[in-house]
Each structure stands twice: as C-alpha cells, then as structure tokens.
Amino acid sequence: MKFNLPLVATFILFIISSLFFSSCQSEEDSFIPKPYGYFRIELPEQSYQKLEGDFPYSFEHSKYAKVVKNTSQNAENYWITLKYEPTSVAEIHITYKEVKNDPKLFMEYVNDAHKITFNEINTARSSAIDQVIDSKNGNGIVFTISEGEVPTVFNYWVSDSSTHFLRAAMYVPTSSQNDSLAPILKYTKDDMMHMLETFEWRN
C-alpha cells in the first residue's frame, strides 16, 4: 500500500499541534468562546396622538416620538423628524414637496424617492419588497429593504399627484447589525404604518 507522504505529514503535524495546545491549557484557564449577544431595549406599549402644528398633512404618531423641525442645510418647509425618547435608536424623517399641478414635477419627486431607495439597495446588495398604496388621500409605494446593513430599512411616499407629495423614511443612525435591532425596527415600522393608515391632507 502506498501513502501520500505530504498528506500523512500534514495529518501528523495536526495531531502533534493539538496535543501541544491541549497540554498547555488547564481545565481552569481554557477559553470557551461565547456567542455574541444583542443588547436588549425595553419598548413601551404603542400609543398614539395626532400631529400638532400648521402642516399641510396630518397623521397620528407615537406618543414616545418627539416632533422636531428638520434644520439640515437642504431642509424645506414642513420637513420634520420624529425622534424616539429616550432611546433615539430609530428616527422617522418626513419630507414634503408641493406638486403645483405639474405632472413633470410629480414624476421628478417619484423618481427621486425611488432612486434613494434603489441606491441603498445596490450599496448593501439587498432587495426590496414594495407595496402599492391606493387610498382616498392618494397613491404611493411602501418599500421594505429585506436584508443588509442600510440606514433606511423602511420608507414610503404618498401623493395626490396634483398638490402634495410626502415621503416618510425610517433611519437607524447606528452601525449595529439590523438583526440586533429587529424588535425596534418592527416597533417603528408598525408606528409608520399607523401613520399611513391615519394619514390625511389638510388642504
């Protein structure tokens, strides 16, 4: 019988190495790796209140989310952020545009909203699940990014196609894996769906 000498030598080296390391470690100081754990955040029972203020739109939002004016450099009128307290793990960004009875302007807003989502999908090599909105207040699309680490995992836009255009997006300003934040993401997504279900244009 012929043996493959390189293979035999490799096997013997593996056995010797295993015996050497096991002899150097006692039972007390041997290291057993522990699985990574995810931090846990207690979430309150969901409760809602009507949006206050002079906005061209209305909805019910979480009582635990503070409404803050968007003060970024490119912010426009009626742009707001819903910040959850005290965790502030997830935020909901609301942007608003006037359509001005301009079909080209409407399509520009739609394309911009889709472009933002698809750019994040391509960056994270993720996929999106979309749902069409068809209600008395207009039409739109809901996007859920199914996997990958992206800052926006859930967003939607809604418009009456002639006067108003609104986009709502959940942002997660953290580098943690989205899997570890699953309960918070679901909680915030449910809040956003409630916002959509109670959504109305004011004028």
Which role fits each region the language model picked out?
Residues H93:
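His/Glu-rich zincin catalytic helix
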Residues F14-L19, S146:
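Intrinsically disordered, low-complexity coil segments
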